[in-house]
From Swiss-Prot:
It comes from Homo sapiens. Residues 574-609 form the EF-hand domain. Changing R153Q: In EJM1; uncertain significance. GO terms for biological process: cerebral cortex cell migration; cilium-dependent cell motility; flagellated sperm motility; mitotic cytokinesis; mitotic spindle organization; regulation of cell division. The gene is EFHC1. Widely expressed. Not detected in lymphocytes. One of its GO terms (molecular function) is alpha-tubulin binding. This is EF-hand domain-containing protein 1. The lineage of its organism: Eukaryota, Metazoa, Chordata, Craniata, Vertebrata.
Length: 640
């Protein structure tokens, strides 16, 4: 820095001051080049930057320099060489015109908006006259954005012309692939380029805004009219006061629907509703207590909310015109809550008192909603096909896997081996059938009947089993309700019709009479009297009839005498008393006949003296054809 002495003071330390404005202390530059020639200039400033007055040009020199033309000194200037040729793709490389535009898109099937404004950027590439349309990506817009039209040359009309940068301007409409774009503005480079090419640009326009987007950007306005209703007072007054209603939801009209019971709680403190489901034990449902959580329930929605799918609707005060209140819950009234209809059939005593004090409603009777069980459907059996018994055929319809009909085990145990035998004749117009005799065996254990025809020599009719064990249906019964013959239907003179054949009962044995007398309640007095009279007549025959019978059948008298002799001779023999029951066990058809081999096996097991000469004679007289023996007369010789 320069120290300048103050005038009038000695040049001593402390009397000089530094000038802070002077910082350059080099010598002035006098040598330089001008138009390629080295020249020397006189210095104009000294050391420290002080201007030198003696090296300045005079006014005359300045005027001479101002009036003297350079041509007089340097001559005519040379013409500049022509510029080199530059191709368009090199000259306009990476030079792009940008225009701001928008297009309008229709929005069908929407209650919120009818059209949508979509803003785009149109890029024009000068190097190859191609264009592209790009829509700026907006977050959470819900539509596909980005590159709408890729870079390409775009057709302007149907004649094959393409868009050129001369066709683009602000404030015009351009149609690209059937979609009209409105150009509103461009960037600074585009404006300078078009103006340099002599194109007059239209004034810029304001970018159109999407009405729905702007609506969503606005804050939610709530115009609430001041009300004199005090919610705090309601909360404090009705705290812990709940109305309880009993309701049902009847969904039986739909497939697999049912009627389910619910409890509706209405909280008076804040007008909220809660629905609980009533579960029963083993009802097959998850024991989740709540069907609907505690909340306010809308009663009347706005018009748009009715058409809009309620499954995605967030209910607020803006979508609801009226909410459910306590006066809407009345016994005997149906309510639709969130799409489900509930019928209120009862309430608790507190709710009845509240409605009486608040609304003056006293008639709230309980409604009986219990449904009576429908009568059981009577199973209709298919027609009887004629095979087997009706019970056997019907058993195939009761289960997928057929089972045998259930039997009365007690009856079978009580009446085991109890057989009632009757002698009958066939009622037939054929003369040969009048002399045929049949033995009816009625099995009390199973109510079945078997018929056996004793074989008669030289009769021309094969005897033996006539009908196996089966139940015989009465002629006046139907297939759907069959009535079978029972013990009370068999008496002297009774007509038994067996599958179209009529038989007349002629005789019976003493066991039948004993059974009828012990079970007189099952028989009519006439039937019991007929059996008793018949047995009485049979035990006291007339002398003339006996003499005639002896003359007619001498073999019977001989058989009776032989039986009496055997009874006297074997009086003290140790044979068993149940010999008759032993033969009946092996006589499955209750015909009174057993095979010869089986006969001797039974006699051997019961210690019967078959080797005795009288017993051999009795066996010979009781023998019949086909190797069978009539054990009825044989057993008489061993009975007491």
């Amino acid at each position: 820095m320069v120290s300048n002495p103050v005038h009038g003071l000695p040049f001593l330390p402390g009397t000089s001051f530094k000038d802070s404005t002077k910082t350059a202390f080099h010598r002035s530059q006098t040598l330089s080049y001008r138009n390629g020639y080295a020249i020397v200039r006189r210095p104009t400033v000294g050391i420290g930057g002080d201007r030198l007055q003696f090296n300045q040009l005079s006014q005359a020199e300045l005027d001479e320099l101002a009036s003297k033309a350079p041509v007089l000194t340097y001559g005519q200037p040379k013409q500049a060489p022509p510029a080199d040729f530059i191709p368009a793709h090199v000259a306009f490389d990476k030079k792009v015109l940008k225009f701001d535009a928008y297009f309008q898109e229709d929005v069908p099937m929407s209650t919120e908006e009818q059209y949508r404004i979509r803003q785009v950027n149109i890029y024009y590439y000068l190097e190859d006259d191609s264009m592209s349309v790009i829509e700026p990506v907006v977050e959470n817009s819900g539509i596909l954005q980005g590159k709408l039209i890729k870079r390409q040359r775009l057709a302007k009309n149907d004649r094959g012309d393409h868009y050129h940068w001369k066709d683009l301007n602000r404030g015009i409409n351009i149609t690209i692939y059937g979609k009209t774009f409105r150009v509103v503005d461009c960037d600074q480079f585009t404006q300078v380029f078009l103006e340099s090419q002599g194109i007059e640009l239209n004034p810029p326009e304001k970018m159109a805004l999407d009405p729905y987007t702007e609506l969503r950007k606005q804050p939610l306005r709530k115009y609430v009219t001041p009300s004199d209703f005090d919610q705090l007072k309601q909360f404090l007054t009705f705290d812990k006061q709940v109305l309880r209603f009993y309701a049902i939801w009847d969904d039986t009209d739909s497939m697999y629907g049912e009627c389910r019971t619910y409890i509706i709680h209405y909280y008076l403190m804040d007008d909220t509703v809660e629905i609980r489901e009533v579960h029963e034990r083993n009802d097959g449902r998850d024991p989740f207590p709540l069907l609907m959580n505690r909340q306010r329930v809308p009663k009347v929605l706005v018009e748009n909310a009715k058409n809009f799918p309620q499954c995605v609707l967030e209910i607020s005060d803006q979508e609801v015109l009226e909410w459910y209140t306590a006066k809407d819950f009345i016994v005997g009234k149906s309510l639709t809550i969130l799409g489900r209809t509930f019928f209120i059939y009862d309430c608790d005593p507190f709710t009845r008192r509240y409605y009486k004090e608040k609304f003056g409603i006293t008639d709230l009777p309980r409604i009986d909603v219990s449904k009576r069980e429908p009568p059981p459907v009577k199973q209709e059996l298919p027609p009887y096909n004629g095979f087997g018994l009706v019970e056997d055929s019907a058993q195939n319809c009761f289960a997928l896997i057929p089972k045998a009909p259930k039997k009365d085990v007690i009856k079978m145990l009580v009446n085991d081996n109890k057989v009632l035998r009757y002698l009958a004749v066939l009622e037939s117009p054929i003369p040969e059938d009048k002399d045929r005799r049949f033995v009816f065996s009625y099995f009390l254990a199973t109510d079945m009947i078997s018929i056996f025809e004793p074989p008669v020599r030289n009769s021309g009719i094969i005897g033996g089993k006539y009908l196996g064990r089966t139940k015989v249906v009465k002629p006046y019964s139907t297939v759907d309700n069959p009535v079978y013959y029972g013990p009370s239907d068999f008496f002297i003179g009774a007509v038994i019709e067996v599958f179209g054949h009529r038989f007349i009962i002629l005789d019976t044995d003493e066991y039948v009479l004993k059974y009828m007398e012990s079970n007189a309640a099952q028989y009519s007095p006439e039937a019991l009297a007929s059996i008793q009279n018949h047995v009485r007549k049979r035990e006291a025959p007339a002398p003339e009839a006996e003499s005639k019978q002896t003359e007619k059948d001498p073999g019977v008298q001989e058989l009776e005498a032989l039986i009496d002799t055997i009874q006297k001779q074997l009086k003290d023999h140790s044979c068993k008393d149940n010999i008759r029951e032993a033969f009946q066990i092996y006589d499955k058809e209750a015909s009174g006949y057993v095979d010869r081999d089986m006969f001797f096996k039974i006699c051997e097991s019961l210690n019967v003296p078959v080797d005795d000469s009288l017993v051999k004679e009795l066996i010979r007289m009781c023998s019949h054809g086909e190797g069978k023996i009539n054990y009825y007369n044989f057993v008489r010789a061993f009975s007491n």
